[in-house]
From Swiss-Prot:
It is found in: Host nucleus. This is Replication protein E1. One of its GO terms (biological process) is DNA replication. It comes from Human papillomavirus 51. The lineage of its organism: Viruses, Monodnaviria, Shotokuvirae, Cossaviricota, Papovaviricetes. GO terms for cellular component: host cell nucleus.
Length: 634
């Protein structure tokens, strides 16, 4: 700011000024407002011009007035600049588009200094060295309120020059429109990428994939679409991705956005979307927002044909063995096999794998759809629930008939064949010796128990708590695949129904009420004579009670009220607490391997039937419920 009448630029309103009055009139000079141009200059006004008495006071008053004027000008300039900053720059307190009332008040307040503000604004930008440009662009960031209280940043460009204040309203209106467009573009980014993918590849991305809502769901096959990949990186991607996968199918097409890559990848192990996105982001150097990652439609024939046809063309690069879901749907013989479903094959599978529960049959058989054509046809059927129910019913019928057809010796041999080797029968012998049971006496007792000898087909394991009674009995039931009955269901007429199909049974933790019930109603069970039991929704059945093992904290042979059971049960006493080592592991291991070795070692002492000659055939031939095929001889 040029202060007229001073030597220097001035040091502010608090500094000293050296005032020098120069009156020189020349032709063409502007006449100040306080002079009368037409008045005659007689020189009379110079009389007593200098008053030596009041010169000091007059000078002080003039300096005070000038300092006050400069302070007012400085304050007005600061307010004008502040209003311009609030107009064109970001305000942390409020939005420039939000409060129009404040702008009107500010405009009326600074109307007197409008011309000076415009001139100073234009002169405030630094010169580039080549003079002031005709049009200068000022970029200011505006903060536009969103719909939900958020904010969206955009860039406003306004022209400089003498017409800057005229174009201010129009420029800010354009800024608001551009900000809304930016918001719309950001919210429709996925739709824009989808449209670009369909325009370039001629097929919708959603037609190739099935959507996983969770990013943590794992799958081994994934379809990935990458946008804006560098052409050089896209060319080298087939080499970079090879260590991570067993198969890939890569297509690369270029557009104005760069290269868009479509990949079908089978990884070495199942991965989730988050892991794959991080891996690809590292390999191709693009953000995860420019990726679509979803699993393919494994049961869609058009999808399989698309990858098959593009895989054999020259527009794609493939590596590894083609996934079976593509091969199954593109080869002719597989399509014929998938058209029919045979219930007998499903029943045979359930019987061979000993899967007898309906829910387990449905779950495990559905997992075979990728490798078994009959399972794939099962999934395509609309009668899956009916097939599962029928399969479970038939498999249980076959298993029940197989179990009834086997003797005790054949059943023990059958269970031994399904147990692993490497057991040690001495673990069982050591545990019996630890409980004070003579091993040879136990062998004699166990032999009559397995044969179902009348009045010797029930063994009671008696002892205080924590002596290993239930552990010993449950390990034997697991190996023999026996049935468990519980006295808690004694209120029902059908609580003894599991004994119908059992080779051996267990009644765990019999209380005094249970012994009273046995003494009143089940004496003939312990005698080994045929008896009748009730079955739910079926007629009564007559059977002989299988060998029954009972654990209890009560010794029935010492109770006078249970005198009729004294000769019907054989008691084993477990009086010592079951031992554990310092790590909490059982000292004596009672598992299937040890029981298998126990029966193999004591087979002859238990008087079990010797294994028949293999030349005469297997005593339990493999079961086959699938119809055979006639072989045509040449």
């Amino acid at each position: 700011m040029d202060c007229e009448g001073t030597e220097d630029e001035g040091a502010g309103c608090n500094g000293w000024f050296f005032v020098e009055a120069i009156v020189e009139k020349k032709t063409g000079d502007n006449v100040s407002d306080d002079e009368d141009e037409n008045a005659d200059d007689t020189g009379s006004d110079l009389i007593n011009f200098i008053d030596s008495e009041t010169s000091i006071c007059s000078q002080a008053e003039q300096e005070t007035a000038r300092a006050l004027f400069q302070a007012q000008e400085l304050q007005a300039n600061k307010e004008a600049v502040h209003q311009l900053k609030r107009k064109f720059l970001v305000s942390p307190r409020s939005s420039p588009l939000g409060d129009i009332t404040n702008q009107n008040n500010t405009h009326s307040h600074s109307q007197a200094n409008e011309s000076q503000v415009k001139r100073r604004l234009l002169d405030s930008y630094p010169d580039s060295g080549y003079g002031n440009t005709q049009v200068e662009t000022v970029e200011a960031t505006l903060q536009v309120d969103g719909q939900h209280g958020g904010s969206q940043n955009s860039v406003c460009s306004s022209g400089g020059g003498s017409v800057m204040d005229v174009e201010t309203t129009e420029s800010c209106a354009n800024v608001e429109l551009n900000s809304i467009c930016e918001v719309l573009k950001s919210s429709n980014a996925k739709a824009t990428l989808m449209a670009k993918f369909k325009e370039l590849y001629g097929i919708s991305y959603n037609e190739l994939v099935r959507v996983f809502k969770s990013d943590k769901t794992c799958c081994i096959d994934w379809v990935c679409a990458l946008f804006g990949v560098s052409p050089m990186v896209a060319e080298n991607l087939k080499t970079l991705i090879k260590p991570f996968c067993m198969y890939y199918h890569i297509q690369c097409l270029s557009c104005d956005w760069g290269t868009i890559v479509l990949m079908l990848i089978r990884f070495s192990c199942a991965k989730n979307r988050t892991t794959i996105a991080k891996c690809l982001s590292t390999l191709v150097n693009i953000p995860q927002s420019q990726m679509f990652i979803e699993p393919p439609k494994l049961r869609s024939t058009p999808v399989a044909l698309y990858f098959y046809r593009t895989g054999i063309s020259n527009i794609s690069n493939t590596y590894g063995e083609t996934p079976e879901w593509i091969t199954r749907q593109t080869q002719l013989q597989h399509s014929f096999e998938d058209s029919t479903f045979e219930l007998s094959q499903m029943v045979q599978w359930a019987f061979d794998h000993e899967v007898l529960d309906d829910s387990e049959i449905a779950f495990h058989y559905a997992q075979l759809a990728d490798i078994d054509s009959n399972a794939a046809a099962f999934l395509k059927s609309n009668c899956q629930a009916k097939y599962v129910k029928d399969c479970g019913t038939m498999a249980r019928h076959y298993k029940r008939a197989q179990r009834k057809s086997l003797s005790m010796s054949a059943w023990i041999r059958y269970r031994c064949d399904r147990a692993k080797d490497g057991g040690n029968w001495r673990e069982i012998a050591k545990f019996l010796r630890y409980q004070g049971v003579n091993f040879m006496s136990f062998i004699q007792m166990f032999k009559q128990f397995l044969k179902g000898t009348p009045k010797h087909n029930c063994i009671v394991i008696y002892g205080p708590p924590n002596t290993g009674k239930s552990l010993f009995a449950m390990s034997l039931m697991k190996f023999m695949q026996g049935s468990i009955i519980s006295y808690v269901n004694s209120g029902s007429h059908f609580w003894l129904q599991p004994l119908e199909d059992a080779k051996i049974a267990l009644l765990d933790d019999a209380t005094y009420g249970c012994w009273t019930y046995i003494d009143q109603y089940l004496r003939n069970f312990l005698d080994g004579n045929p008896c009748s039991i009730d079955r739910k929704h079926r007629s009564l059945i007559q059977l002989v009670c299988p060998p029954l093992l009972i654990t209890s904290n009560i010794n029935p042979q010492e109770d006078a009220n249970l005198m009729y059971l004294h000769t019907r049960v054989t008691v084993l006493k477990f009086l010592n607490t079951f031992p554990f080592d310092n790590n909490g592991n059982a000292v004596y291991t009672l598992n299937d391997e040890n029981w298998k070795n126990f029966f193999s070692t004591t087979w002859s002492r238990l008087d079990l039937e010797e294994e028949e000659d293999k030349e005469n055939g297997d005593p339990m031939p493999p079961f086959k419920c699938v119809p055979g095929e006639n072989t045509r001889l040449l």
